Design a protein with these regions (language model features):
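Short, intrinsically disordered N-terminal pre-domain segments
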Residues: 1-18, 111-113
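Short, flexible coil/linker segments at or flanking structured domains
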Residues: 3, 28, 47-48, 52, ...
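Exposed alpha-helical structural elements
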Residues: 6-10, 28, 78
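Generic detector of leucine side chains in alpha-helical contexts
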Residues: 11-15, 39-40, 59-60, 76
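Short loop/turn elements at secondary-structure junctions
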Residues: 20, 24, 51-113
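Amphipathic alpha-helical segments that form the core helices of the histone-fold
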Residues: 22-46, 57-65
Length: 113
């Protein structure tokens, strides 16, 4: 899985990288970002793009910071509540879409009724 330039730049900002990373560092951060995005898509929200300003974007930053510290294996345990909440929101969104609800309509209107 590949991360976008926007997501890569978000990760650099989260890691406080103020220099131009060398090729090895860039590849490592991109690989960690891709692994984190894959994990979040698998366990939290399959549709998440992990863009800046989103819950999954912040979770991805947290994952990459853990990975950079050599502690990526602690992520699922330490952020379990956030992952479950994100998964619940995804499931509710899919359920609502299946019932004909749309986000723009608000909370109690359906299409075609």
């Amino acid at each position: 899985m590949v991360i976008t330039e926007t997501v890569y730049n978000m990760l650099l900002r989260a890691l406080h990288v103020t220099y131009t990373p060398d090729e090895d560092t860039e590849q490592r951060i991109r690989a960690e970002g891709a692994a984190g995005k894959d994990l979040l898509n698998r366990y939290a929200d399959p549709d998440a793009d992990c863009e800046p300003g989103t819950r999954c974007g912040q979770l991805l930053c947290d994952y990459v910071m853990r990975a950079e510290a050599g502690a990526a294996e602690t992520f699922l345990v330490d952020f379990a509540q956030d992952i479950v909440e994100t998964k619940s929101e995804y499931d509710a969104r899919i359920w609502a879409a299946g019932k004909g609800y749309t986000e723009a309509e608000g909370n109690a209107e359906t299409q075609g009724d």
